[in-house]
Swiss-Prot record:
The gene is apgM. It catalyses: (2R)-2-phosphoglycerate = (2R)-3-phosphoglycerate. This is 2,3-bisphosphoglycerate-independent phosphoglycerate mutase. It comes from Methanococcus aeolicus (strain ATCC BAA-1280 / DSM 17508 / OCM 812 / Nankai-3). Catalyzes the interconversion of 2-phosphoglycerate and 3-phosphoglycerate. The keyword Isomerase applies. Residues 156-177 are annotated as: Disordered. Pathway: Carbohydrate degradation; glycolysis; pyruvate from D-glyceraldehyde 3-phosphate: step 3/5. The lineage of its organism: Archaea, Methanobacteriati, Methanobacteriota, Methanomada group, Methanococci. Keywords: Glycolysis, Isomerase. GO terms for biological process: glycolytic process. Pfam families: Metalloenzyme, PhosphMutase. The keyword Isomerase applies. Disulfide bonds: none annotated.
Length: 406
């Protein structure tokens, strides 16, 4: 038996004035079929009352306790862009930004610069006070930064004020340890050296000539020490894989040593190629015991406050699920359909509202739920669960769980 965890990123929502959500209003005959034939419930990925990030949510959905394994977003971003991170590294996500001569931020995204490969080379490989600087752009103005060396700490502040019109803040230690003081000093030096190198870089000289904003600074944030996480396959004694279009989810998969399946046209946006992702899933379950697939577009629509786009994208996912169900044997595969968090249109950000969930496959205890939405599935047999419960439930259903006790 195989298990699939199908994540519709940002799926859940809050009712509008008419009492509807994009999911409730969408035409979703396949999701409703799964609800009728499966066991339903509602879920909070991390915990009741906690609005999680996609990082902490996916750790929980993979069976890890985010309160003990999550150190910050930086390590997962760095891993996702292809940096071979090691336990003890200090990692950050970064923006290329535009600053003036006083390091006051003019634009946090450097005019949404498209190509930063040459700028990356100016920073990657630096040595500062015996610490190696690893830097990799991840498309456009985004990048990841890793500090590697002895006596480092993630107990430091960020180098990003998250707003414009203010200077790049001085990075400071958050405790009195020598490691934190040393790391803060090193990161401040990296920010200064990066500005010196980027400010006079030929790419930026050319941008100035063309009337474009220079990408002459970096803003590190999301600091975290790379955690030592038990590999997913070792933890569960199964072979697992991940399909996703976003670097963050890719990084989480790599961090827990799931095989990452690259899919052409998987963009992490509403224009992602759902057919290619579906085919990748169908191929993956031939050789893997467990596959997590993340589809991101609904979350993007939510962050933009676009109700109709979210509804339409959910309907596209329903057609994708129809294609998947038509090409698998229900007696051989369990599919868990849920989200990682709610992203209400009214809030344009993640919330703690629980998410609908259904587990579809043979021998599940089918309940009386007939539609898949935020208002129906809570009546189902799964009741109210947490993300960490999903993998153990699937291991039990697929006959791969070990008895606890004598």
């Amino acid at each position: 038996m195989k298990a699939v965890v199908f994540i519709i990123d940002g799926l859940g929502d809050r009712p509008n004035k008419q009492g509807n959500t994009p999911l409730k209003e969408a035409h979703t005959p396949t999701m409703d079929k799964m609800a009728k034939e499966g066991i339903c419930g509602i879920m909070n990925a991390v915990d009741i009352g906690v609005g999680p990030g996609s990082d902490t949510a996916h750790l929980a959905l993979l069976g890890y306790n985010p309160y003990t394994t999550y150190t910050g977003r930086g390590p997962f971003e760095a891993c996702g862009v292809g940096i071979d991170v090691k336990a003890g590294d200090i990692a950050f996500r970064c923006n290329f930004a535009t600053v003036d001569d006083n390091l006051t931020i003019i634009d946090r995204r450097a005019g949404r610069i498209k190509n930063t490969e040459e700028l990356e080379k100016a920073i990657d490989g630096l040595k500062v006070d015996g610490v190696e600087v690893i830097f990799k752009q991840s498309g456009g103005y985004r990048a990841a930064l890793v500090l590697r060396g002895p006596n480092l700490s993630d107990k430091i502040t960020e180098g990003d004020p998250h707003k414009e019109g203010v200077p790049i803040p001085e990075v400071k230690p958050l405790d009195n340890s020598e490691d934190a003081k040393r790391t803060a000093t090193i990161l401040n030096k990296v920010i200064k050296i990066a500005h010196d190198k980027l400010n006079s870089h030929p790419v930026n000289e050319e941008r100035r000539k063309n009337g474009e904003l220079p990408a002459n600074a970096i803003l590190p944030r999301g600091v975290g020490m790379v955690p030592n996480i038990q590999p997913f396959n070792e933890k569960n004694d199964i072979k697992g894989a991940c399909i996703a279009g976003t670097g963050l989810i890719k990084g989480i998969a790599k961090m827990v040593q799931l095989d990452y399946i690259d899919v052409e046209g998987a963009t992490g946006t509403p224009t992602t190629n759902l057919k290619n992702k579906a085919d990748a899933l169908l191929n993956a379950i031939k050789t893997y015991d467990f596959v997590l697939i993340n589809v991101k577009g609904a979350d993007e629509a939510s962050h933009d406050g676009n109700y109709e786009l979210k509804k339409e994208f959910i309907e596209k996912i329903d057609k994708m699920l129809k294609y998947i169900l038509e090409n698998i044997d229900k007696n051989e595969v369990y599919i868990t359909l849920t989200g990682d968090h709610s992203t209400p249109i009214e809030k344009k950000d993640h919330s703690a509202d629980p998410i609908p969930i259904v587990i579809w496959g043979k021998s599940v205890r089918v309940d009386a739920v007939e539609t898949f939405d935020e208002f129906s599935t809570y009546k189902g047999g799964l009741c109210w669960i947490k993300g960490e419960n999903i993998v153990p439930i699937l291991l039990d259903l697929t006959g791969k769980a070990h008895k606890y006790g004598a």
